[in-house]
Design a protein with these regions (language model features):
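Domain-level signature for soluble enzymes in the chorismate/prephenate branch of the shikimate pathway
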Residues: 1-268
């Protein structure tokens, strides 16, 4: 694949998405966008050579919007990285917990810190924003608190401790390239989306394609299909090099067993 000169991620600067982008493509010029759909748009329209998105958190699970976008957009995951997430509570200097009436952050960050918020800020309204870094602008409100801030700014006080429910908190990020640039020919992990036939045993039939060949599943997650109430799309990650005849055979059999089947990523 071509070199990465420009990489898109969720902004503004100072987010974990920016850190993941520096990690996955350290030489790239980073372009920040306000929403995840805008990140995908930049990649598809050629304004960036690659994009970086969070896809799963070890506490809060899949980043559902990005799972849904990856399934329908013209992008494919070609690399991944897992970053340790250290969430702090940010306030203006001198603000006490009892004075905080609103807590702002991305839905994922608030979900990852639910126990702390339930215990110490049960009275505070929880308001979702597009990104944790963008929430910092809201600290002009005296009664505001921000979850997830990890960069210091003038007049901002950070909690001394990580407030996440679990201290071993990691988020997986994908490096995306345009699907038209081709799929990697090698990679020890394959990520795909599948919709099984709506009949007894169809999911078992899909999973048997891999179990019968000793191929391990490292992730399986279901998402409702909005246009078909009561039916689900499965997002599945397997351990296996896509260049292996055994893995290719399993994927081909899985494709034939499903109503729809789409490979979303091949990476190490």
């Amino acid at each position: 694949m071509a070199a990465i000169g420009r990489a898109a991620c969720l902004g503004p600067a100072g987010s974990y998405s920016e850190l993941a982008t520096h990690t996955l493509c350290p030489q790239a010029h980073i372009l920040f966008f306000p929403t995840f759909p805008a990140v995908f748009d930049a990649l598809e329209e050629g304004r960036s050579d690659a994009a970086v998105i969070p896809i799963e958190n070890s506490i809060h699970g899949g980043v559902l919007q990005n799972l849904d976008l990856l399934e329908v957009r013209a992008a494919v995951a070609v690399a991944e990285v897992r970053l340790r997430i250290d969430h702090r509570l940010a306030t203006r200097q001198g603000v006490r917990l009892s004075e905080i009436t609103r807590v702002y952050s991305h839905e994922q960050a608030i979900g990852q810190c639910a126990r702390f918020l339930d215990e110490y800020l049960p009275h505070a309204e929880r308001i979702f924003t597009d990104s944790t870094a963008k929430s910092l602008a809201l600290l002009d409100e005296h009664s505001a608190g921000i979850v997830g801030a990890h960069t210091r700014a003038e007049g901002v006080c950070l909690s001394p401790e990580n407030i996440a429910d679990e201290k071993n908190n990691f988020t997986q990020f994908f490096l995306l390239r345009r699907r038209t640039d081709g799929m990697p020919e090698r990679g020890k992990t394959v990520f795909f989306a599948a919709v099984c036939e709506h009949r007894p045993g169809s999911l078992l039939e899909l999973l048997t394609c891999f179990a019968a060949r000793g191929i391990n599943l490292t992730r399986i997650e279901s998402r409702p299909i909005p246009s078909v109430p009561g039916e689900y799309r499965f997002f599945i990650e397997i351990e296996g090099d896509i260049s292996s005849p055994c893995v290719r055979e399993a994927l081909a059999q899985a494709r034939s067993a499903c109503r729809t089947f789409r490979i979303l990523g091949v990476y190490d």
